[in-house]
A protein has these predicted regions:
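Long, low-complexity, Ser/Thr/Gly/Pro-rich intrinsically disordered segments that act as flexible linkers
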Residues: 1-42, 47-53, 192-196, 206-208
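Amphipathic alpha-helical segments
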Residues: 1-2, 9, 83, 157-167
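Short, flexible beta-strand-to-coil junctions
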Residues: 19-21, 62-67, 167
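Internal, hydrophobic cores of structured domains that mediate oligomerization or house catalytic pockets
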Residues: 26-129
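Aromatic/basic-lined ligand-recognition segments
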Residues: 95-230
Length: 230
């Protein structure tokens, strides 16, 4: 019996809808997320306008063992974006539902923010949640005790933490104390100069796992403004 607090699923999956103005050799007919939902998860008016001009659909699905899912879903996303570029199309990620506004060469596992969206619905109660990490077999993350007035700094810390989670999962169980460095944050935010940032500045966090909702609960052990950005 495993002593790991967080269970590791055998396989994970992710799906993309390639939407094109003209039909390809094969066409799928999966019901698409509505515009309100796509907008809620960050899709822009410009991308939604492009989507309206692309009525034809090709479903691209990725399923792989959890141990290799990160590389598999990265390659699947690149494939979808490559096809979109070839056929003047657009790619919709199905979970979380959003239009992907990336070029194939921009796809990066290190740039963790590419792989999740933030749910601010309960920010007034001090809670910040991710949506998207499930595709790696990870639980979604909830950060507790977030100050709504300064949540942008917590957003940044979360980008650094998810950078580490994606890189270390499933080899390392995430539960317990952890340290998020300014370099981790830079990688998670997609900073091209991340590798040159000194590792000195950091903030400690405590990560717990709640099996019922299957979520990681994160508590910051300090003020990001003082620990990282002062």
């Amino acid at each position: 019996m495993s002593t790991r607090p967080v269970p590791v699923p055998e396989t994970c999956s992710a799906s993309y809808a390639l939407m094109t103005p003209d039909a390809l050799d094969h066409e799928d007919h999966l019901a698409m997320p509505n515009e309100a939902l796509l907008r809620r998860y960050g899709s822009t008016d410009e991308s939604l306008a492009r989507l309206r001009e692309c009525p034809h659909q090709l479903l691209i699905h990725c399923q792989a063992p959890t141990e290799v899912m990160a590389d598999a879903v990265r390659d699947c996303r690149i494939q979808a974006l490559d096809l979109a570029a070839q056929h003047d199309g657009i790619v919709v990620e199905l979970l979380p539902p959003r239009v992907l506004e990336l070029r194939p060469e921009q796809v990066s596992l290190a740039h963790a923010q590419q792989w999740y969206v933030l749910d601010y619905d309960d920010l007034s109660e001090g809670l910040l949640r991710t949506d998207g990490l499930e595709q790696f077999g990870l639980p979604e993350v909830t950060v507790a005790d977030v100050d709504p007035a300064t949540h942008a700094m917590t957003d940044a810390v979360l980008a650094g933490l998810t950078h580490r989670l994606i890189a270390e999962w499933p080899t390392n169980d995430p539960v317990g104390p952890a340290t998020v460095t300014l370099r981790d944050i830079a990688f998670g935010l997609g900073d091209a100069e991340a590798s040159r940032i000194p590792e000195g500045r950091a903030i400690d966090v405590i990560i717990d796992y709640e099996p019922g909702p299957h979520r990681l609960i994160v508590e910051l052990m300090g003020d990001p403004a003082e620990a990282l950005f002062a």
